[in-house]
Amino acid sequence: MGAITLDGKATRDEIFVDLKQRVSELNASGRTPGLATILVGEDPGSQAYVRGKHSDCAKVGITSIRRDLPADISTATLNETIDELNANPDCTGYIVQLPLPKHLDENAALERIDPGKDADGLHPTNLGRLVLNTPAPLPCTPRGIVHLLRRYDVPIAGAHVVVIGRGVTVGRPLGLLLTRRSENATVTLCHTGTRDLPTLTRQADIIVAAVGVPHMLTADMVRPGAAVVDVGVSRVDGKLTGDVHPDVWEVAGHVSPNPGGVGPLTRAFLLTNVVELAEQR
C-alpha cells in the first residue's frame, strides 16, 4: 500500500475559489488588488514562473502588472523600477523574481521593496516580524507547506519535524512558522553540517526536504507512516526532479509529489498575501 498523495493542485483550486469571492468583495468596495512582477533577463524557468503567476491572477480577478527588464540593466534602473512600484497605487504587492543576474545584488533589491507591498514575505522587516510573531505577509512556500499538512489532517502540534535545508525562502522561515503556538511542532533544522542525517530523519513524524539534490531522501531514511514534503527542485535530463526518491512512497504515510505538491500552493499564497494586503487597506 502506497502513501496518500498530498495534492497541491486540488488544494490550490480550493484556495482560488475563496480568493475569487474575496476579490469580488474588494472590487465592490473600490479596492481592486494588483500583483506586479519584476523579471530581469530571459531565464526560461523564471519566465515560466512569472507567466504562471499572471495566469493565476486572471483566474481569481487580481490585476496583474509586469515589468520585464533586459539582463544587462544597471542597478540604478532596477532601483527605479522598484521605486515606481512602491509608489504605484494600482500595485498592492509585488515580487522581484529570483535569481537576478550576477551583477545585481539580490539582498539590496529585496530590501528596497516597500515592506507593505512585499508579496513574497521575504523582506527583512517581514522576516523579523515572523521572528517576533507579529502580523506581516508570510513567506509563501512555508505557508503552503503548513496549509497542505493541515488540509490532509497530518498532525502538527507536538510533532517532530525535520527540515532539510536552511535557505531563506523555505528552511529558516518554516522552522519559525512551525514553532509558533498555533502549530506547536518541535523542529530540527538540518543542513550540510548535520552529522548522521538518516538517524534524525528516522525519528521524524514529518520530513520536509528542501535542498535541491535529486532523490537525496531515500526509503531507508524514513520512518514508516511519516509524512514527507518534497520542496527541492532540480533538473535531471531536462525534467524537474524533487529531493524525494520514488521508493519513499512505499514507506511513508503521506507524500507530496514534485511537481504538483507544494509548488501550486506557493503561487496560491502569493495571491493570498496580495488579497490580505488589499483587505487591510
Curated annotation (Swiss-Prot):
Pathway: One-carbon metabolism; tetrahydrofolate interconversion
Quaternary structure and interacting proteins, as annotated: Homodimer.
PANTHER family reported for this sequence: C-1-TETRAHYDROFOLATE SYNTHASE, CYTOPLASMIC (PTHR48099:SF5), C-1-TETRAHYDROFOLATE SYNTHASE, CYTOPLASMIC-RELATED (PTHR48099)
UniProt keyword annotation of Oxidoreductase present: yes
GO BP field: L-histidine biosynthetic process; methionine biosynthetic process; purine nucleotide biosynthetic process; tetrahydrofolate interconversion
Function according to Swiss-Prot or TrEMBL: Catalyzes the oxidation of 5,10-methylenetetrahydrofolate to 5,10-methenyltetrahydrofolate and then the hydrolysis of 5,10-methenyltetrahydrofolate to 10-formyltetrahydrofolate.
InterPro entries linked to this entry: Aminoacid_DH-like_N_sf, NAD(P)-bd_dom_sf, THF_DH/CycHdrlase, THF_DH/CycHdrlase_cat_dom, THF_DH/CycHdrlase_NAD-bd_dom
Source superkingdom: Bacteria
Catalyzed chemical reaction(s): (6R)-5,10-methylene-5,6,7,8-tetrahydrofolate + NADP(+) = (6R)-5,10-methenyltetrahydrofolate + NADPH; (6R)-5,10-methenyltetrahydrofolate + H2O = (6R)-10-formyltetrahydrofolate + H(+)
Protein name from the UniProt record: Bifunctional protein FolD
Originating organism: Mycobacterium marinum (strain ATCC BAA-535 / M)
A single cellular component GO annotation: cytosol
Pfam families (alphabetical): THF_DHG_CYH, THF_DHG_CYH_C
Entry keyword set: Amino-acid biosynthesis, Histidine biosynthesis, Hydrolase, Methionine biosynthesis, Multifunctional enzyme, NADP, One-carbon metabolism, Oxidoreductase, Purine biosynthesis
GO molecular function, one term: methenyltetrahydrofolate cyclohydrolase activity
Protein family per UniProt: Belongs to the tetrahydrofolate dehydrogenase/cyclohydrolase family.
